[in-house]
């Protein structure tokens, strides 16, 4: 058992913050570093540092496994059965988990699914999470089809930013890859997000050879006049969705070959390397989970809709927080952070992810 030590600071003669670094050992001789930053007037900020020096300040929370689309790389063709309510986290448990994470230093929370906007009560849930003291950024990843209905409400509920999944600009190919749905619904959703006041919306585009590699330039062109960020993401060999093979895999380097005028901005945004067309209003992000693993900078943990805490996306290690109090959840999260591996295993056609779930059951 690991105990988070608490220090009270009643007076400080120096206006600058003091930083106390604690190293706490558990019975396995593993250790976790906890930075306690003490400010005047007893303000206290906790930062969790794992065994490999990574600051864990980001949590992805999947609130539902169900989706109104059936994307081939995310979900089995026949979809998934709706599970009994008692097997899933309750509204209150999701909020408690967010509170526990924030108490340990998480500052950014992302709501995912499935499709989070099909969850009953999603607006109230977002409002409750955004109201937690310490949440600096609340984001949501959505397929965008329901944003015409919900974008304004999400903004009012405190959601700061949206990522919208869109893998093709061709209506026929959209119908194929999603097995249902309408491209126009997503385009309307992107517009609704803009009207609602969301800025710097990110479009997540999974690169797939033989499917959308001929649309790379078209996606990049969307950034010329609009402040969007197109995020090209390498297809990962995960779950039982679309087959991953060498022909299907497209490295992000292909984007730079097809659009050589893209200029690097010299910095990264999380896991994305950022580029821009000269004079463009928006920008392009390249995310390389396969060709260039970024484990050394991993700052996140994941919580599935059925209450399983995943220290690593590509590991089948999971710890349940369902039915636990907020305090118990916090203890479990500390153990999960200690359990984060230094590196994931290899990812390629011969070495699929060890995640143990389809992406819709993890949170995309």
Predicted regions mapped to residue ranges:
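Intrinsic low-complexity, disordered N-terminal segments enriched in polar/charged/small residues
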Residues: 12-16, 24
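Short, positively charged and aromatic/hydrophobic N-terminal segments
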Residues: 6, 19, 32-39, 44
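Canonical Radical SAM [4Fe-4S] cluster-binding loop centered on the CxxxCxxC motif
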Residues: 51-89, 313
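Auxiliary Fe-S-binding modules of radical SAM enzymes
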Residues: 46-58, 224-225, 235-364
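Radical SAM/AdoMet-radical enzyme domain recognition
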Residues: 88-111, 118-233
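A short acidic, helix-capping loop that chelates divalent metal ions and anchors anionic groups
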Residues: 79-84, 170-177, 239-243, 320
């Amino acid at each position: 058992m690991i105990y988070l030590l608490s220090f009270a600071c009643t007076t400080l003669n120096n206006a600058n913050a003091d930083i106390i670094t604690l190293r706490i050992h558990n019975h396995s001789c593993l250790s976790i570093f906890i930075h306690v930053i003490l400010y005047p007037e007893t303000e206290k900020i906790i930062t969790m540092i794992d065994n490999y020096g990574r600051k864990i300040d980001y949590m992805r929370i999947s609130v539902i496994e169900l989706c109104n689309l059936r994307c081939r790389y995310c979900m089995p063709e026949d979809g998934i059965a709706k599970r009994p309510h008692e097997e899933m986290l309750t509204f209150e448990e999701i909020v408690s988990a967010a509170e526990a994470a924030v108490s340990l230093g998480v500052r950014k929370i992302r709501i995912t699914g499935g499709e989070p906007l099909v969850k009953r009560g999603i607006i109230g849930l977002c409002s409750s999470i955004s109201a937690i003291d310490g949440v600096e950024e609340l984001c949501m990843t959505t397929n965008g089809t329901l944003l015409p209905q919900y974008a304004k409400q999400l903004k009012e509920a405190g959601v700061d930013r949206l990522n919208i999944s869109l893998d093709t600009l061709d209506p026929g190919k959209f119908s194929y890859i999603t097995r249902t749905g309408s491209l126009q619904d997503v385009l309307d959703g992107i517009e609704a997000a803009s009207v609602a006041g969301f800025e710097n919306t990110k479009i997540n585009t999974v690169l797939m050879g033989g499917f959308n590699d001929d649309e790379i330039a078209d996606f990049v062109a969307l950034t010329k006049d609009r402040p969007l960020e197109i995020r090209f993401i390498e297809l990962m060999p995960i779950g039982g969705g679309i087959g991953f093979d060498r022909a299907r895999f497209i490295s992000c380097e292909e984007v730079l070959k097809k659009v050589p005028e893209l200029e690097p901005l010299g910095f990264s945004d999380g896991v994305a390397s950022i580029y821009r067309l000269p004079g463009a209003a928006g920008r392009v992000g390249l995310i390389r989970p396969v060709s260039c693993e970024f484990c050394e900078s991993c700052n996140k943990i994941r919580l599935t809709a059925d209450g399983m805490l995943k220290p690593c996306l590509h590991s089948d290690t999971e710890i349940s927080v369902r039915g636990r109090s907020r305090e118990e959840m916090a203890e479990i999260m500390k153990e999960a952070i200690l359990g984060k591996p230094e590196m994931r295993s290899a990812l390629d056609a011969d070495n699929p992810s060890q995640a143990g779930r389809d992406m819709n059951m993890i949170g995309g």
